Amino acid sequence: MTESIDQHDHYLGDRAKNYSAHHDKNLRTRLTTRQEQAVLRKAIEKSGRPKSAMDIPCGTGRFLSVFRDCGVAELTAADASTGMLEVAKHARPDDAVSVLHTSAFDIEMPNNSIDFIACLRFFHHLSVKEDRMQALNELKRVSRKHVAISLWTNGNLASFRRRNKPPPPAVSGYGKRICRRSDEIEPEFLDAGFKIVDHYDVWPMISMWRLYLLQIEET
Protein backbone atom coordinates (compact mmCIF):
# COMPACT_ATOMS: atom_id res chain seq x y z
CA MET A 1 0.00 0.00 0.00
CA THR A 2 1.24 3.49 -0.82
CA GLU A 3 1.01 5.42 2.43
CA SER A 4 1.80 8.85 0.94
CA ILE A 5 -1.32 8.68 -1.21
CA ASP A 6 -3.67 7.54 1.52
CA GLN A 7 -2.38 9.80 4.28
CA HIS A 8 -1.40 13.03 2.54
CA ASP A 9 -3.96 15.34 0.93
CA HIS A 10 -2.22 17.29 -1.83
CA TYR A 11 -5.15 19.66 -2.41
CA LEU A 12 -6.13 21.19 0.92
CA GLY A 13 -7.17 24.81 1.34
CA ASP A 14 -7.21 26.85 -1.85
CA ARG A 15 -5.21 24.33 -3.91
CA ALA A 16 -8.33 22.51 -5.11
CA LYS A 17 -10.02 25.78 -6.08
CA ASN A 18 -6.85 26.90 -7.84
CA TYR A 19 -6.72 23.58 -9.71
CA SER A 20 -10.28 24.12 -10.89
CA ALA A 21 -9.53 27.71 -11.94
CA HIS A 22 -6.42 26.59 -13.84
CA HIS A 23 -8.47 24.44 -16.21
CA ASP A 24 -10.77 27.36 -16.99
CA LYS A 25 -8.17 30.11 -17.22
CA ASN A 26 -7.91 30.52 -21.01
CA LEU A 27 -9.13 29.24 -24.36
CA ARG A 28 -6.47 26.52 -24.59
CA THR A 29 -7.31 24.95 -21.23
CA ARG A 30 -11.04 25.15 -21.91
CA LEU A 31 -10.63 23.51 -25.32
CA THR A 32 -8.48 20.77 -23.79
CA THR A 33 -11.15 20.07 -21.19
CA ARG A 34 -13.75 19.89 -23.95
CA GLN A 35 -11.60 17.44 -25.92
CA GLU A 36 -10.99 15.30 -22.84
CA GLN A 37 -14.72 15.21 -22.22
CA ALA A 38 -15.29 14.22 -25.85
CA VAL A 39 -12.90 11.24 -25.73
CA LEU A 40 -14.39 10.12 -22.40
CA ARG A 41 -17.83 10.25 -24.01
CA LYS A 42 -16.57 8.05 -26.86
CA ALA A 43 -15.21 5.51 -24.39
CA ILE A 44 -18.44 5.41 -22.38
CA GLU A 45 -20.53 4.94 -25.50
CA LYS A 46 -18.22 2.21 -26.84
CA SER A 47 -18.51 0.37 -23.52
CA GLY A 48 -22.25 -0.03 -24.12
CA ARG A 49 -23.64 2.91 -22.14
CA PRO A 50 -23.21 1.57 -18.59
CA LYS A 51 -25.84 2.12 -15.93
CA SER A 52 -23.36 2.68 -13.09
CA ALA A 53 -20.03 4.50 -13.14
CA MET A 54 -17.33 5.88 -10.87
CA ASP A 55 -14.92 8.75 -11.50
CA ILE A 56 -11.80 8.18 -9.35
CA PRO A 57 -10.00 10.37 -8.60
CA CYS A 58 -12.76 12.77 -9.61
CA GLY A 59 -10.76 15.90 -8.82
CA THR A 60 -12.96 18.97 -9.00
CA GLY A 61 -15.67 17.16 -10.95
CA ARG A 62 -14.89 18.42 -14.46
CA PHE A 63 -16.03 15.18 -16.07
CA LEU A 64 -19.12 14.29 -14.02
CA SER A 65 -21.61 15.83 -16.46
CA VAL A 66 -20.30 13.58 -19.25
CA PHE A 67 -21.49 10.47 -17.42
CA ARG A 68 -24.97 11.88 -16.97
CA ASP A 69 -25.09 12.95 -20.63
CA CYS A 70 -24.31 9.33 -21.55
CA GLY A 71 -27.21 8.00 -19.50
CA VAL A 72 -25.35 6.80 -16.40
CA ALA A 73 -28.00 6.43 -13.69
CA GLU A 74 -25.79 5.61 -10.69
CA LEU A 75 -22.73 7.87 -10.53
CA THR A 76 -20.07 8.03 -7.81
CA ALA A 77 -17.49 10.80 -7.52
CA ALA A 78 -14.54 9.50 -5.48
CA ASP A 79 -11.27 11.08 -4.41
CA ALA A 80 -8.66 10.74 -1.67
CA SER A 81 -8.59 14.54 -1.30
CA THR A 82 -11.25 16.17 0.87
CA GLY A 83 -10.35 19.49 -0.74
CA MET A 84 -11.11 18.17 -4.22
CA LEU A 85 -14.35 16.56 -3.05
CA GLU A 86 -15.59 19.84 -1.58
CA VAL A 87 -15.17 21.54 -4.96
CA ALA A 88 -16.60 18.52 -6.82
CA LYS A 89 -19.79 18.66 -4.76
CA HIS A 90 -20.60 22.01 -6.36
CA ALA A 91 -19.74 20.70 -9.84
CA ARG A 92 -22.13 17.74 -9.62
CA PRO A 93 -24.78 17.76 -12.35
CA ASP A 94 -27.31 16.83 -9.65
CA ASP A 95 -27.46 15.95 -5.95
CA ALA A 96 -28.01 12.27 -6.77
CA VAL A 97 -24.30 11.90 -7.57
CA SER A 98 -22.73 10.03 -4.65
CA VAL A 99 -19.54 11.43 -3.14
CA LEU A 100 -17.01 9.00 -1.68
CA HIS A 101 -13.77 9.78 0.18
CA THR A 102 -11.49 6.91 -0.82
CA SER A 103 -8.17 6.15 -2.49
CA ALA A 104 -7.64 4.57 -5.91
CA PHE A 105 -5.17 2.27 -4.16
CA ASP A 106 -7.79 0.91 -1.76
CA ILE A 107 -11.30 1.62 -3.07
CA GLU A 108 -13.96 1.27 -0.41
CA MET A 109 -16.43 -0.52 -2.67
CA PRO A 110 -17.41 -4.20 -3.01
CA ASN A 111 -16.03 -6.45 -5.73
CA ASN A 112 -17.66 -6.17 -9.17
CA SER A 113 -19.93 -3.33 -8.05
CA ILE A 114 -19.52 -0.71 -10.83
CA ASP A 115 -20.07 -1.14 -14.58
CA PHE A 116 -17.57 1.52 -15.71
CA ILE A 117 -14.72 3.21 -13.83
CA ALA A 118 -12.83 6.24 -15.12
CA CYS A 119 -9.38 7.00 -13.71
CA LEU A 120 -8.32 10.21 -15.40
CA ARG A 121 -5.15 12.31 -15.11
CA PHE A 122 -3.70 10.05 -12.41
CA PHE A 123 -1.44 7.30 -13.72
CA HIS A 124 1.21 9.67 -15.11
CA HIS A 125 1.77 10.81 -11.50
CA LEU A 126 2.79 7.26 -10.49
CA SER A 127 6.49 6.69 -11.12
CA VAL A 128 6.71 3.31 -9.36
CA LYS A 129 5.39 0.25 -11.20
CA GLU A 130 4.15 -1.40 -8.00
CA ASP A 131 1.91 1.61 -7.33
CA ARG A 132 0.48 1.46 -10.84
CA MET A 133 -0.21 -2.26 -10.52
CA GLN A 134 -1.86 -1.73 -7.12
CA ALA A 135 -4.22 0.84 -8.64
CA LEU A 136 -4.92 -1.35 -11.69
CA ASN A 137 -5.74 -4.31 -9.48
CA GLU A 138 -8.16 -2.22 -7.42
CA LEU A 139 -9.88 -0.85 -10.53
CA LYS A 140 -10.24 -4.38 -11.86
CA ARG A 141 -11.59 -5.64 -8.54
CA VAL A 142 -14.36 -3.04 -8.31
CA SER A 143 -15.32 -2.85 -12.00
CA ARG A 144 -17.68 -5.34 -13.59
CA LYS A 145 -16.30 -4.85 -17.09
CA HIS A 146 -14.74 -1.57 -18.27
CA VAL A 147 -12.10 0.88 -17.05
CA ALA A 148 -10.94 4.10 -18.75
CA ILE A 149 -7.50 5.49 -17.92
CA SER A 150 -5.99 8.75 -19.19
CA LEU A 151 -2.34 9.71 -18.89
CA TRP A 152 0.60 11.23 -20.71
CA THR A 153 2.16 8.97 -23.32
CA ASN A 154 4.71 9.22 -26.13
CA GLY A 155 4.47 9.31 -29.93
CA ASN A 156 3.49 12.97 -30.31
CA LEU A 157 4.99 16.43 -30.68
CA ALA A 158 4.78 17.30 -26.98
CA SER A 159 6.67 14.18 -25.91
CA PHE A 160 9.28 14.75 -28.64
CA ARG A 161 9.95 18.22 -27.26
CA ARG A 162 10.51 16.71 -23.81
CA ARG A 163 12.87 13.97 -25.04
CA ASN A 164 15.99 15.58 -23.54
CA LYS A 165 14.35 16.63 -20.29
CA PRO A 166 15.34 14.27 -17.45
CA PRO A 167 12.34 12.67 -15.73
CA PRO A 168 11.66 13.59 -12.11
CA PRO A 169 13.06 11.17 -9.52
CA ALA A 170 10.94 8.11 -8.83
CA VAL A 171 8.93 8.42 -5.63
CA SER A 172 6.45 6.10 -4.01
CA GLY A 173 2.89 7.34 -4.42
CA TYR A 174 1.62 10.51 -6.05
CA GLY A 175 4.48 12.48 -7.60
CA LYS A 176 5.34 14.79 -10.47
CA ARG A 177 4.00 14.05 -13.93
CA ILE A 178 5.92 11.62 -16.13
CA CYS A 179 5.35 10.77 -19.78
CA ARG A 180 4.90 6.99 -19.88
CA ARG A 181 5.93 5.12 -23.00
CA SER A 182 3.04 3.21 -24.57
CA ASP A 183 5.24 0.09 -24.82
CA GLU A 184 5.70 0.33 -21.05
CA ILE A 185 2.18 1.07 -19.82
CA GLU A 186 0.24 -1.15 -22.24
CA PRO A 187 1.93 -4.39 -21.05
CA GLU A 188 1.06 -3.37 -17.50
CA PHE A 189 -2.61 -3.19 -18.47
CA LEU A 190 -2.34 -6.70 -19.89
CA ASP A 191 -0.47 -8.01 -16.84
CA ALA A 192 -3.27 -6.70 -14.61
CA GLY A 193 -5.83 -8.76 -16.55
CA PHE A 194 -7.22 -6.20 -18.97
CA LYS A 195 -7.40 -6.13 -22.73
CA ILE A 196 -7.15 -2.83 -24.60
CA VAL A 197 -10.42 -2.14 -26.40
CA ASP A 198 -9.36 1.19 -27.89
CA HIS A 199 -7.43 4.36 -27.23
CA TYR A 200 -8.28 7.99 -27.95
CA ASP A 201 -5.77 10.83 -28.29
CA VAL A 202 -7.03 14.17 -27.00
CA TRP A 203 -5.07 16.14 -29.61
CA PRO A 204 -3.73 13.51 -32.06
CA MET A 205 -0.01 13.80 -32.87
CA ILE A 206 0.24 16.98 -30.76
CA SER A 207 -0.62 16.39 -27.11
CA MET A 208 0.61 13.68 -24.74
CA TRP A 209 -2.90 13.11 -23.39
CA ARG A 210 -4.34 9.70 -24.28
CA LEU A 211 -7.34 7.81 -22.90
CA TYR A 212 -7.36 4.01 -22.93
CA LEU A 213 -10.57 2.00 -22.80
CA LEU A 214 -9.85 -1.32 -21.07
CA GLN A 215 -12.01 -4.40 -20.60
CA ILE A 216 -11.54 -7.07 -17.97
CA GLU A 217 -10.41 -10.32 -19.55
CA GLU A 218 -12.80 -13.20 -18.93
CA THR A 219 -11.24 -16.12 -17.07
Question: Residue locations for each model-derived region?
Answer:
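Short alpha-helix
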Residues: 175-192
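A short glycine-rich, Lys/Arg-flanked "PGG" loop and its adjoining helix->strand segment in the class I
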Residues: 133-145
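Short catalytic micro-motifs in class I SAM-dependent methyltransferases
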Residues: 121-125
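Conserved beta-strand signature within the Rossmann-like core of class I S-adenosyl-L-methionine
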Residues: 144-152
